[in-house]
């Protein structure tokens, strides 16, 4: 529930609510407040009823009532509270509270009671004194409450228990409200008081039980959720070879095992203990407690199994990657040796001594290769054991065997640990398997391991072997070549004797140095590799032996070294001038130093290896010792049954504990050896930089050994304690059980007989009562037997829990490398004791019930005997027979009832015993002898259905809300434009709020996390529901089995199958798709709307141009220049084409500029977060897009400038042609003839139009065919709309006299032509767009089809037999790698496609969310602007204070907007004045026409003179003005849209829509009405303009030869037009006066603007993550006093107040922390602040904090 509702209007009691997002805490507070109000109403009702009863008694006595007003006030208060309760109930019901319907029903009942109470009040106090109404029947009320309380049960899930807690709190308050009235009523008897006390005690007990049950179930649910998350994390983890982050997973795993496992286990055990305590205390919610205990136990057991699997997987992953690493190292080493053999051991250009040295080194190299052969063989052996991890991420080509790592219960059956299965299909997290019988199974992949071998590992091992053999052969060949060269050099003539001797000595020193280097490498080769894990002791012993061999070799080298150095020194002394003397001297010193360093290194290495050997020996002894004790303990699955065996087992454990303490000294020895090893390692590291690789492992093993010892000691101690407590409890239980059993066996029977006399019957009755008393006294013994049984069972359970814990720890330690044979566990003795105790309790209950029934039978029979009169023997015998028959019938009925009761109790006990047996058997493990097949039934999840319905409702609300917001946005934009037009000249009142959040907006991530949490909650609830259904099914099955076969033991397993309802999932996906379609449809509608608007503007322009085509002219001479006319028409068309291109270029330029500004603003945003260090860099994609847009902008500007230049040239040419003017000759004929003829040009025009329509029709048909073909070719590219370019062609037509029929035909043809032209333009544009897309696609395909040239270097090798096997191996390896690469490429393409699809969906969702948020913010911002502009108070100020870290600065864009609006207002005024000036010539012309005389003439002319009248020019100017108005409106709309987007982003976090939504709706209604009025006015003006244009054309069509009748009609139309124009002028004048008046009222307003910055510093507690103030942090000890003073000094609270009035603008800086104010003007005058600095602040380059420091003079 994530919505909170607005506060109610305190003046009205309406239950209507409005929602917003709330949290769970707020909803719980709402429910708590609702309960308080309901309790208050209940108390008011009870109090009112009591007062009315008191007044009724007084009225019966003839006295006046006392509580009339008080009772009426209580009723009124209750009604008010009921209004509030209805509203809160509506909120709770709307938020889908589980008890929403129940709460509404309770409130309805309270309302009915209050209504009835008001009626009673009115009736009682309005009538005269009469008979008093009956009082409240408290006895009946208490009985009803008792019955209701006794019928209550306990819920099985947490939501139901929560609702029961809330309901019982209300019930308990009602019970407590009855108490004071019973105390006041003295006439109540003690029996009623006792009933009330019983009711109160029972209500308190239920309240405590519900509270404890709720707390226990909540903690169990928390643990179940944690365990479920942990299990899911391990199941979803990647355990394949692709995961290289396994070391961090290993550290995380060991950290949890060492630090958190015991604590978590303690919590689980604590829950189990508390559950047992609740069951022991006979908690009424036994079923719920047992179910949660079993669920926690099952989940914990599954979690331990997953830990075992995780340990195994980590080990296999480490082995896999270590093998590949070692293999890579070995291959690198062999490649290096091969390279050395090729380069270093070449015999070319070397003398004899160098070759001898190379031969010695080559001998050493061959020895090293001999030793390295063991490494290669070891890697080959390890390759046989490597697990094929690659198959975990892909399905193998054929089924492969897998091995189970743990026990797991799947839907199809049980998976046993250690058994083999066959993998059929790899589905990622889940695998499809088959067992040995062919049964199909499905289980998580984490529970299985694919056994060796790995084909890739085998191929690598074979490749390594081939490489090793090749290197050996090459070494042999190199040695042979060096030997041959050496023999050749020996036969050659030696040179100078001294040089020869020097070279011999150098060769000897080189040999000694190479020997020393070889020994040093051998020592480091021993020190650097870590000891082998499985044979550390043997490995350390072998290394010690190797060091001893090195010592012997070093002793052999020492004499040779001494001899060589002595000979070299003698040679240097004898021949110091020899060329080799300096080199010999240097070589001698180096050899001596190297020898000394080697001796020290050898000593340190021997000490290190010896210490490591001792440490490993001590660790091995400790492990073997602990393993022996652990193996002895792990054999005990459960506790022995008999008492003597218990004592013997306890003695064994005590002896084991003493032995462990005796061997504790071994751990001390291990610790000492570890310290010595650390010292040796530190010495090697400091002197020789040789670090020990085994030290960390040895420390971990020592720590693990100590931990195992402590665990073992605790295990032994706890087991001994459990045995001791079990022994004592078992002895007590046996003695009590035997006593009660003997007593029950010896219980006498006092059944009434037919022949019993009255005295005998009384004696039997007395004995039966004594027997019942004795049974009642024995009941305490039965309870003691039950308590002893529970204590024994708990001890056994603790013992078994410790055994299971030890087994789990050992599994985790060993990693389950080898499978332990499963064996059937023995039945727990606790189960046997539990069965005996249950049977004893059932038998005792049976005996007690039988004897109570006997007592009733005896009393009944005794009463019958006492009622019979004394009579004769015959009558007495007859009466006795009748009595016996009646009693027999009664006894039969009661006997049947008794049998049914016993049967029911027996079944209940058997169900309980079966449940306990199920739990016991689950703790013990699976019984191999019994198998139970279960049928799962899918039950719809109520919570999921509820969430589904809520999602449907939310989707419908969001769609409706989006539509309303769009409508409100359009209305408010119109209203904003009108108001801004009114306030352009005056001082504008506004508040600039620019908020920069210091923390990042993570709304999307929060929504994703919230959705995940809700989904997890739904899954848990669904799992709980399915578990309950399964439990009920198992109970029914158990009861049926027990009824048919009582002695059968059945092992039940609960299988919880988590599976969502497919229908709900399909519906949920359908709703998501519908949501996406709604968003897409909305975008399409917006695009269609914009297209229709553009089309409407184009049609209006075409209509105006079409109206202008018919030009009315006065013909004087009939002659025209055809060439000039054609040229003018061509220039006109060219002009319109260029103008259209210029406009489109300007629009593209504006759009590109807007995109660039948006990207720059987006990239310029700075996100700062103090808690987390983040580095914000611009998006490279955004930067590249900005660069592309800038290039496009430059190109468009260049094209635009070229178009402007061409347009200017055309305009100048057109002006020159117009200035030429026509040549006119006038010849006047005095004959007057009136002649009506049809214009031949009109006939030609009609014919031309007909032909053009036919052409256009054929062209459209061809275009339709082409478009259909194009659409078939590019169906995937139809989404984008083509750009339509409309060409407007203006043609002037000369018309003399119009025939009415011809005129109608021309109009119809012209309309058809216009429609065909529009269709043609649209189709041509669409065809051009489709052709462009086809061209682009063909280019892309052409680029993809380019040939790729692959150069391959072909090397031909000779067929050498030795390399053939290696080549074959490499070929197979390469083929395998290529296949793997192909698979990876296919997978990569699939993932990329999936990623693109997900990104597209995310972008669509983000656009939808941003569009909705933008619409909401638009409504909020426009409402705020409207409120600010319409406020008419003298002084207006708005103070904005944010406790967050904000930076408020002025917005220069808004200032420019205001200046632009003022300029547009001035322009509108100027246009109105022009219109008024143009009206005057029209009036004068009308007057002249009225006075003119009418003459008829026949006029012939030889040329045409085109003149435009004043009226036509006026119409043209009006049209032009209307177009300018439309253009200005569009520009204003685009500017307002941009500003609205910017302001909505700035005011996002300061919106107040929730508080002002009511006012907005009223304003929205007003604005809609005003918009309608404006639209009507606009249509009226347009119709008037069209009418004026029509009338003017009609007037111009009449020549001077018309008759007087025609002239009068035309004059009448002109008069009407003038009247309309006058009226329009008056309306405009009135509107201008109103605007001036409103502007005058706005101009006198003062403007006050406040910028506020408050910096508060918080300190984050590293332990809790809570934010603290510096004072709290100082008190908590997180910071010292110095830091506290520093942080306090950095806090600030600056506020800028700017007031603008008639005298100008003044600004001050207010320090709200100290109360001081600093004037900015004074700071400018005094020089503390410069004008440049202030301009920087105004332009947002300087923060208010920096300005405040400068103004205050603090810096």
From Swiss-Prot:
Q: Where are the Plectin repeats?
A: 1650-1684, 1699-1734
> Which SMART domains does this UniProt record tie to the protein?
PLEC, SPEC
* Annotated localization: Cell junction, Desmosome; Cytoplasm, Cytoskeleton; Cell membrane; Cytoplasm
Q: Which PROSITE patterns does this one have?
A: SH3
Q: Which GO terms describe its biological process?
A: intermediate filament cytoskeleton organization; keratinization; regulation of antibacterial peptide production
Q: What segments bear the compositional bias annotation Basic residues? A: 1-11
The coiled-coil regions, if any, are: 16-125, 182-387, 611-819, 883-1644
According to its UniProt entry, what is the function of this protein? Component of the cornified envelope of keratinocytes. May link the cornified envelope to desmosomes and intermediate filaments. May act as a localization signal in PKB/AKT-mediated signaling.
The protein's name is Periplakin
**What is the source species?**
Mus musculus (Mouse)
Please name the taxonomic classification of the source: Eukaryota, Metazoa, Chordata, Craniata, Vertebrata
Q: What would be the name of the gene that encodes this protein?
A: Ppl
């Amino acid at each position: 529930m994530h919505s909170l509702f607005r506060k109610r209007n305190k003046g009205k009691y309406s239950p209507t609510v409005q929602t917003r997002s709330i949290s769970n805490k707020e909803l719980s507070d709402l429910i708590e407040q609702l309960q308080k109000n309901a309790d208050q109403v209940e108390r008011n009702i009870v109090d009112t009823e009591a007062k009315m009863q008191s007044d009724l008694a007084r009225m019966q006595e003839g006295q006046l009532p006392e509580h009339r007003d008080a009772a009426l006030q209580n009723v009124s208060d209750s009604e008010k509270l009921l209004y509030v309760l209805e509203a809160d109930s509506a909120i709770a019901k709307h938020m889908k509270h589980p008890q929403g319907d129940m709460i509404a029903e309770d409130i309805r009942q309270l309302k009915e009671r209050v209504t009835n109470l008001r009626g009673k009040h009115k009736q009682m106090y309005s009538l005269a004194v009469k008979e008093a109404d009956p009082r409240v029947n408290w006895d009946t009320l208490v009985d009803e409450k008792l019955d209701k309380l006794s019928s209550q049960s306990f819920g099985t899930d947490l939501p139901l228990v929560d609702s029961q807690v809330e309901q019982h709190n209300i019930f308990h308050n009602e019970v407590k409200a009855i108490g004071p009235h019973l105390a006041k009523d003295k006439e109540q008897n003690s029996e009623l008081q006792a009933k009330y006390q019983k009711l109160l005690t029972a209500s308190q007990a239920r309240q405590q039980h519900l509270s404890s049950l709720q707390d226990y179930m909540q903690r169990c649910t928390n643990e179940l959720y944690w365990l479920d998350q942990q299990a899911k994390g391990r199941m979803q983890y990647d355990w394949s070879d692709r995961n290289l982050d396994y070391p961090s997973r290993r550290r995380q795993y060991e950290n949890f095992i060492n630090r958190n496992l015991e604590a978590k286990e303690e919590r689980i055990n604590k829950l189990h203990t508390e559950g047992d305590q609740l069951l022991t205390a006979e908690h009424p919610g036994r079923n719920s407690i047992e179910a949660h205990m079993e669920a926690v136990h099952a989940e914990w057991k599954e979690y331990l199994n997953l830990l075992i699997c995780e340990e195994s997987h980590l080990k296999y992953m480490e082995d896999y990657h270590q093998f590949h690493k070692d293999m890579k190292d070995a291959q690198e080493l062999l490649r290096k040796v091969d390279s050395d053999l090729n380069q270093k051991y070449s015999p070319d250009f070397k003398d004899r001594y160098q070759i001898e040295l190379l031969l010695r080194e080559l001998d050493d190299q061959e020895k090293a290769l001999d030793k390295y052969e063991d490494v290669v063989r070891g890697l080959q052996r390890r390759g046989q054991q490597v697990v094929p991890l690659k198959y975990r991420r892909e399905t193998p080509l054929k089924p492969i065997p897998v091995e189970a790592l743990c026990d797991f219960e799947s839907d199809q059956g049980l998976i046993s640990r250690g058994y083999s299965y066959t993998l059929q299909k790899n589905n990622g997290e889940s695998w499809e398997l088959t067992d040995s019988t062919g049964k199909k199974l499905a289980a998580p992949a984490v529970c299985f391991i694919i056994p060796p071998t790995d084909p890739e590992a085998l191929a690598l091992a074979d490749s390594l072997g081939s490489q090793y053999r090749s290197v050996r052969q090459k070494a042999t060949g190199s040695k042979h070549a060096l030997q041959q060269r050496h023999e050749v050099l020996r036969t050659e003539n030696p040179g100078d004797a001294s040089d020869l001797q020097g070279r011999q000595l150098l060769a000897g020193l080189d040999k000694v140095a190479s020997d020393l280097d070889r020994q040093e490498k051998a020592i480091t080769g021993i020190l650097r590799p870590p000891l082998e894990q499985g044979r550390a002791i043997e490995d350390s012993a072998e290394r010690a032996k190797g060091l001893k061999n090195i010592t012997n070799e070093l002793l052999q080298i020492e004499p040779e070294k001494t001899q060589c150095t002595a000979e070299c020194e003698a040679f240097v002394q004898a021949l110091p001038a020899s060329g080799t003397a300096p080199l010999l001297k240097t070589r001698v010193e180096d050899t001596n130093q190297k020898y000394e360093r080697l001796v020290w290194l050898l000593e340190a290495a021997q000490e290190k290896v010896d210490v490591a050997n001792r440490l490993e020996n001590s660790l091995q002894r400790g492990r073997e010792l602990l393993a022996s004790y652990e193996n002895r303990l792990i054999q005990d699955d459960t506790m022995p049954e008999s008492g003597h065996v218990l004592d013997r087992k306890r003695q064994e454990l005590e002896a084991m504990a003493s032995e462990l303490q005796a061997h504790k000294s071994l751990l001390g020895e291990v610790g000492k050896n570890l310290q010595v090893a650390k010292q040796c390692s530190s010495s090697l590291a400091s002197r020789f930089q040789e670090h020990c690789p085994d030290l960390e492992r040895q420390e971990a093993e020592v720590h693990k050994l100590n931990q195992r010892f402590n665990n073992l000691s605790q295990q032994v101690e706890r087991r001994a304690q459990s045995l001791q407590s079990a022994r004592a409890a078992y002895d007590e239980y046996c003695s009590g059980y035997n006593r009660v059993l003997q007593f029950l066996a010896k219980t006498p029977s006092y059944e009434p007989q037919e022949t019993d006399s009255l005295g005998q019957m009384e004696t039997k009755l007395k004995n039966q009562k004594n027997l019942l008393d004795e049974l009642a006294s024995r009941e305490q013994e039965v309870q003691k037997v039950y308590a002893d049984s529970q204590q024994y069972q708990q001890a056994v359970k603790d013992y078994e829990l410790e055994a299971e814990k030890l087994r789990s720890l050992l599994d985790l330690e060993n990693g389950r490398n080898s499978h332990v044979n499963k064996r059937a566990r023995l039945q727990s003795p606790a189960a046997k004791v539990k069965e005996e105790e249950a049977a004893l309790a059932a038998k005792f209950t049976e005996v007690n019930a039988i004897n109570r029934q006997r007592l009733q039978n005896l009393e009944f029979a005794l009463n019958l005997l006492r009622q019979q009169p004394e009579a004769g023997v015959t009558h007495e015998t007859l009466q006795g027979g009748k009595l016996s028959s009646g009693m027999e019938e009664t006894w039969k009925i009661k006997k049947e009832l008794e049998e049914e009761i016993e049967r029911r109790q027996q079944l209940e006990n058997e169900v309980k015993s079966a449940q306990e047996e199920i739990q016991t058997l689950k703790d013990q493990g699976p019984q191999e002898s019994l198998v139970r097949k279960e049928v799962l039934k899918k039950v719809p999840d109520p919570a999921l259905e509820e969430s589904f319905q809520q999602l449907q409702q939310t989707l419908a609300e969001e769609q409706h809300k989006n539509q309303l917001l769009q409508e409100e946005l359009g209305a408010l934009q119109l209203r904003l434009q009108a108001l801004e037009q009114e306030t352009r000249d005056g001082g504008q009142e506004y508040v600039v709020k620019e908020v920069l959040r210091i923390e990042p907006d993570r709304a999307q991530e929060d929504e994703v996390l919230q959705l995940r949490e809700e989904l997890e909650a739904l899954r848990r609830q669904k799992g709980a529901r399915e578990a309950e259904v399964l439990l009920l099914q198992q109970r029914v099955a158990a009861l049926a089995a027990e009824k048919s076969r009582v002695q059968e033991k059945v092992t039940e397993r609960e299988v919880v199958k988590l599976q969502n309802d497919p229908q709900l999932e399909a519906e949920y996906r359908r709703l998501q798709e519908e949501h996406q379609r709604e968003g897409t449809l909305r975008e399409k509608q917006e695009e269609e709307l914009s297209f229709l608007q553009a089309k409407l503007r184009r049609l209006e322009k075409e209509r105006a141009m079409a109206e202008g085509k018919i030009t009315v002219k006065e013909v004087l001479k009939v002659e025209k220049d055809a060439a000039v006319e054609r040229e003018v028409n061509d220039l006109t068309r060219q002009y319109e084409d260029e103008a259209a291109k210029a406009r489109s270029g300007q629009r593209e330029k504006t759009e590109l500029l807007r995109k660039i500004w948006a990207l720059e603003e987006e990239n310029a945003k700075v996100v700062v977060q103090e808690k987390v260090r983040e580095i914000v860099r611009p998006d490279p994609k955004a930067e590249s897009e900005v660069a592309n847009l800038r290039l496009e902008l430059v190109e468009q500007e260049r094209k635009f400038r070229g178009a402007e230049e061409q347009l200017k040239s055309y305009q100048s040419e057109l002006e020159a042609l117009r200035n030429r003017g026509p040549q006119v000759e006038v010849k006047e004929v005095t004959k007057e003839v009136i002649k009506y003829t049809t214009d031949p040009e009109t006939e030609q025009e009609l014919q031309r139009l007909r032909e053009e329509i036919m052409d256009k029709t054929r062209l459209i048909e061809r275009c339709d065919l082409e478009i259909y073909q194009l659409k078939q070719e590019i169906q995937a590219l139809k989404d984008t709309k083509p750009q339509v370019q409309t060409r407007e062609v203006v043609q002037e037509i000369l018309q003399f006299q119009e025939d009415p029929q011809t005129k109608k035909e021309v109009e119809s043809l012209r309309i058809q032509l216009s429609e065909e032209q529009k269709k043609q333009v649209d189709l041509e544009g669409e065809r051009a767009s489709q052709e462009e897309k086809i061209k682009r696609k063909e280019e892309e395909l052409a680029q993809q089809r380019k040939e790729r040239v692959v150069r391959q270097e072909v090397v031909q090798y000779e067929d050498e037999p030795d390399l053939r096997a290696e080549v074959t191996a490499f070929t197979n390896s390469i083929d395998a790698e290529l296949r793997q690469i192909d698979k990876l490429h296919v997978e990569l393409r699939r993932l990329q496609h999936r990623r693109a699809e997900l990104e597209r969906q995310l972008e669509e969702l983000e656009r939808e969310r941003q569009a909705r948020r933008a619409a909401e913010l638009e409504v909020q911002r426009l409402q705020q602007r409207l409120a600010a502009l319409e406020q008419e108070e003298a002084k207006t100020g708005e103070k904005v204070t944010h406790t967050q870290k904000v930076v408020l600065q002025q917005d220069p864009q808004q200032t420019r907007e205001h200046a632009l609006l003022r300029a547009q207002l001035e322009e509108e005024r100027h246009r109105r004045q022009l219109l008024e000036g143009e009206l005057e010539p029209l009036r004068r012309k009308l007057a002249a026409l009225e006075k003119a005389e009418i003459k008829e003439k026949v006029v012939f002319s030889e040329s045409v003179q085109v003149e435009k009248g004043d009226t036509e020019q006026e119409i043209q100017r009006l049209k032009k003005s209307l177009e300018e108005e439309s253009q200005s409106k569009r520009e204003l709309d685009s500017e307002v849209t941009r500003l609205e987007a910017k302001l909505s982003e700035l005011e996002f976090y300061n919106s107040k829509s929730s508080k002002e939504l009511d006012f907005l709706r009223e304003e929205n209604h007003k604005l809609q009405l005003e918009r309608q009025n404006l639209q009507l006015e606009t249509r009226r003006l347009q119709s008037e303009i069209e009418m004026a244009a029509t009338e003017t054309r009609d007037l111009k069509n009449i020549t001077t030869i018309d008759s007087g009748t025609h002239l009068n009609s035309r004059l009448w139309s002109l008069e009407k037009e003038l009247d309309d124009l006058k009226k329009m002028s008056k309306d405009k004048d009135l509107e201008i006066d109103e605007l001036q008046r409103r502007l005058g009222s706005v101009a006198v307003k003062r403007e006050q603007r406040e910028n506020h910055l408050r910096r508060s510093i918080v300190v984050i507690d590293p332990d809790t993550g809570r934010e603290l103030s510096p004072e709290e942090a100082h008190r908590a000890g997180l910071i010292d006093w110095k830091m506290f003073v520093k942080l306090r000094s950095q806090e600030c609270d600056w506020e800028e107040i700017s007031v603008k009035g008639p005298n100008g603008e003044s600004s001050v800086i207010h320090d709200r922390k100290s109360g001081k104010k600093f004037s900015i003007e004074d700071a400018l005058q005094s020089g503390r602040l410069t004008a440049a600095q202030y301009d920087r602040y105004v332009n947002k380059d300087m923060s208010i904090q920096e300005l405040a420091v400068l103004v205050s003079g603090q810096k």
